[in-house]
Every structure is written in structure tokens, then in C-alpha cells.
């Protein structure tokens, strides 16, 4: 059954979604980044056009983003539209926002389970991947749990080649967070080039990492994504050859336990 709050919000946004009413819409949590929010009746997501399209946003990911940005009005609206309070609590546990959103009584789902759902949400489109990237890098509430979960995800069902382990090791040693490396890797793995360009613009020092990973998958689009000198490309190719020369092309994806043990013993 649809709640009274949801019905009221829907009626308000349908009748007042024009310029002179933006103050009211902001106050009710129906505006975000100067755009009016609508709940999609087809996919139950969130959009700016009041019609279903591939631009509809996942409510849970969107909820986490607005909480990180401390926009509690929009967070309340998304919760009333059915976004998961577990996600909200993950990002505001033991803070004033937790009480303001009244999610302190929500059952304490383990962070690792929620993070697993979060890190499996990147497949839908570039924007979903970028939201995940921003959340993992902006939030201060993950600490050790994030590192462990990202490590598990990388090792268990993403990595195809031992050379990838070495690449993560090299750049992790340069103090780039695992979550950042993970999202860059996913952008290449799932060919999300728009997201990849935006991420590397934020962290230009990760260009070589993107090259290395792209060459490992024989993905020449990664090269075309940036304006790079021949020297940079040549250097990356040489590093790939050197890494594969040391570790070979031994694939270990078929045995998750072995992959995890190998990673624990050698690279972390």
C-alpha cells in the first residue's frame, strides 16, 4: 500500500513542478541539483523527467549519495518512496543524521553484506558506476570493512590474471585507495568509458593504471580514451610485457579459494 506521505508528495510535484515553486519543492525534498525529482512508476527508480528511461536512478544508490552530501530533505523523500533504510544507516551510523532520519532502530545488517550489494550495482550504466565511485571515496564510515569487502570482490569474481594482482599492488603502494582502484578496474572491465574518463580526470595519476589494466584485457579503447604521448603508451606496454613475463598468463579465476589464499599470501 502506498503511504499517505508518498501520495501527497506525488500530488505536489505533479502540480507544482515549475520555477516559481522551487522553494517549496526544495523544502519537501523534491529538488536535487536544480532539478525536480519524480518516482518512476515503471521501474520504481528516480528520474528528472517523470517518464521511464535508461536514465532512471537506483533509489538506494541515490539515497546514499544524498546522505553523503547531507541533504536530509531528499533523503526523507527517498525513504518514503521505498529506498532501503539499511543503506541510509550504513552511511550515517552514530551521527546526527541517523537520528534526524529516524533510522537508528533499523535492524543492523552487516556492512559487508550491504557493501556487496553496493559493489555489484555498477553493471547497469556509467552513472551507476560513477555514483558507486563517489560514494566509496567520499564516505568516512567504511574504514576496515570497505577494504576487506573490496579486496574480496576483486579477488573472488573479477580478477582474470595474476598480472592484475601485481598492478593493484603497484598502485596500492602509491597510497591510492582500494575502492578507487576497484572502480577504475570495473570501468575498464565493463567498458564504461564515459565513467572511466571522469574518474581519471579526478585522479590523473591513475592514467598508467588504466593503461596497464586495459592492455591486460587487450582493450585498445582505453588508449583512445586519453590524449597520451607515444612514450606513455610504450612505457605501459613494456610494463605489461615485464609483468606477464614474470607471472605468465596463468589463469586462476576458476578457484576462488585459491585466488583468495594467493592474494593474502603474496600481495596484501
UniProtKB/Swiss-Prot annotation:
The chain crosses the membrane at residues 176-193. GO terms for cellular component: host cell membrane; membrane. It is a single-pass membrane protein. Keywords: Early protein, Host membrane, Membrane, Transmembrane, Transmembrane helix. It is found in: Host membrane. Signal peptide: none annotated. It comes from the Viruses. Residues 1-175 are cytoplasmic. Residues 194-268 are extracellular. Induction: Expressed in the early phase of the viral replicative cycle. Plays a role in virus cell tropism, and may be required for efficient virus replication in macrophages. Belongs to the asfivirus MGF 300 family. This is Protein MGF 300-1L. The lineage of its organism: Viruses, Varidnaviria, Bamfordvirae, Nucleocytoviricota, Pokkesviricetes.
Amino acid at each position: 500500500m502506498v503511504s499517505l506521505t508518498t501520495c501527497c508528495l506525488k500530488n505536489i510535484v505533479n502540480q507544482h513542478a515549475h520555477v516559481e515553486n522551487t522553494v517549496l519543492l526544495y523544502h519537501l525534498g523534491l529538488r536535487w541539483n536544480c532539478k525536480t525529482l519524480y518516482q518512476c512508476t515503471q521501474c520504481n527508480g528516480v528520474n528528472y523527467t517523470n517518464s521511464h528511461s535508461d536514465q532512471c536512478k537506483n533509489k538506494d544508490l541515490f539515497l546514499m549519495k544524498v546522505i553523503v552530501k547531507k541533504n536530509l530533505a531528499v533523503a526523507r523523500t527517498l525513504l518514503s518512496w521505498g529506498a532501503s533504510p539499511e543503506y541510509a544507516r550504513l552511511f550515517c551510523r552514530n551521527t546526527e543524521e541517523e537520528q534526524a532520519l529516524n533510522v537508528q532502530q533499523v535492524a543492523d545488517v552487516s556492512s559487508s553484506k550491504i557493501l556487496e550489494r553496493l559493489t555489484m550495482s555498477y553493471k547497469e550504466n556509467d552513472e551507476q558506476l560513477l555514483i558507486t565511485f563517489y560514494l566509496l571515496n567520499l564516505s568516512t564510515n567504511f574504514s576496515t570493512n570497505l577494504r576487506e569487502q573490496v579486496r574480496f570482490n576483486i579477488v573472488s569474481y573479477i580478477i582474470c590474471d595474476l598480472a592484475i594482482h601485481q598492478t593493484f599492488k603497484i598502485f596500492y603502494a602509491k597510497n591510492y585507495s582500494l575502492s578507487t582502484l576497484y572502480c577504475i578496474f570495473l570501468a575498464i572491465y565493463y567498458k564504461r568509458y564515459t565513467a572511466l574518463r571522469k574518474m581519471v580526470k579526478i585522479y590523473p595519476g591513475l592514467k598508467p593504471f588504466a593503461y596497464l589494466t586495459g592492455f591486460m584485457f587487450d582493450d585498445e579503447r582505453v588508449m583512445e580514451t586519453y590524449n597520451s604521448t607515444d612514450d606513455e603508451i610504450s612505457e605501459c606496454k613494456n610494463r605489461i610485457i615485464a609483468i606477464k613475463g614474470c607471472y605468465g598468463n596463468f589463469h586462476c579465476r576458476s578457484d576462488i579459494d585459491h585466488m583468495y589464499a594467493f592474494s593474502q599470501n603474496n600481495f596484501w
